[in-house]
Amino acid sequence: MLKWVQGGVSALTGSAEPEYGAEAFESVSKSVDGKNPYGSLTLPELNWLKPAGSNVETQTFYFFSKDGKQFGHVQIIHSNPLGIQNTAQFTFRLSNADKPEENVWSSTNVEEFEPVGPNFTAKGPMDGVNIKLVPSVDDDGKTTEAFHVKIHVSDEVKLDLTFTRSVEGFKIGPTGQSKYGEDLNNPWGAMRHSFWPRASVSGTIEVANKDKMELDNDFGFFVHATQGMKPHHAASKWNFITYQSPKYSAVVMDYTTPPSYGSSRVTIGGVASAEKLLFTSANATVEHVETKEDEEVGWQVPTLIKFECEGPKVDVADEDVDKPENRGKAVLQGNLTHLERMDVMAEIPAFLKSLASTVSGTKPYIYQFRNEMELELEIDGEKIQDKGQIFCEATFIS
């Protein structure tokens, strides 16, 4: 995830935190220990939270063309990294598997913005930003929700996309939150994720000097993320994957806190079929099976990765979550095709970048990968092999 991009300059304002220890962090997994981790996602829980103080909040919409050739994402970042002034930014990625030279990355600050409920508007030199949650009806006639995303803030990119929820959304547990603080009943920070693991995407993408791209019920994924503290104080590294195929979808989100919070790890996820959410997990795992050093910056970058997500089916009662017949397991393992390395602090002047790295121990890079991968799924006594598209990120902060 682009968490560090959302608040990179905040590294310039403070040093590493004191060593509070693991006892000053409470993973969301604790709230569901011995219980079904599935938490339903109500409409009010799609609202922007806008926490007080330093924070970063995002809505990110991913799309995959059904032919596997094109992928991208649209992200709105609403942040207050210094706890002083809110800012907003629109980022857009479009990658073409057949013509990588035509890949597009765009980032634009927006003004006069307003997050209200689940919606977001901003004025711009063109038509601005207008993201609105609207009632919708899926192909089977069932009532659902959709985000209508219209963005035109530069000559480079114009978007008109509708992301319609295909299966149940979810969070982990009753709140979806991990908490930071010496008094966890009154935490000074929090991390929260909520997901639409599978969506249908239709609409148009217009990029300068390129043919208009049309999506028609292609694959989509949505995540709403909130960090109620400075990004480099919340996590030292991240792993993320979303998998999409005609039959199945999966997501795993993994992060490790800095040593100031005991290098605690949170790994959550969920798996869906084309028809319904199957199971969620508060104890998923991620392994960098093979790595290669990025000699320029020193990080060990994964070249072969394994994500494992196991948990009870969403309709299983708490007392029955450990019964084998009530559980599902999914494994994503394969080689990674490098898409891009993002130097988060590249635009900060060299002397400030050096200062930030010295003071905060930060050298944040995001490694993005995009390729096909096989999904191994075990559920209801069946072993299923599936093949689909993945987008994966490995983020190193400190």
Swiss-Prot record:
- The yes or no answer to whether the keyword Oxidoreductase is present is no
Q: Which subcellular locations apply to this protein?
A: Golgi apparatus, cis-Golgi network membrane; Endoplasmic reticulum membrane; Cytoplasm; Nucleus
Record GO terms (molecular function): ceramide binding
Alphabetically sorted, this entry's keywords are: Cytoplasm, Endoplasmic reticulum, Golgi apparatus, Lipid transport, Membrane, Nucleus, Transport
GO CC annotation: cis-Golgi network membrane; cytoplasm; endoplasmic reticulum membrane; nucleus
Main location class: Golgi
Annotated Pfam families: Svf1, Svf1_C
BP-aspect Gene Ontology terms = ER to Golgi ceramide transport; response to oxidative stress
Report the membrane topology from the UniProt record: Peripheral membrane protein
Q: Which InterPro entries match?
A: Ceramide-binding_SVF1 (IPR051385), Svf1-like_C (IPR033394), Svf1-like_N (IPR013931)
Q: Where is this region: Peripherally associates with membranes?
A: 1-18
Function per UniProt: Ceramide-binding protein that may transfer ceramides from the endoplasmic reticulum membrane to the cis-Golgi network membrane, and is thereby required for the biosynthesis of complex sphingolipids.
Query: Belongs to which family?
Result: Belongs to the SVF1 family.
Protein name in the entry: Ceramide-binding protein SVF1
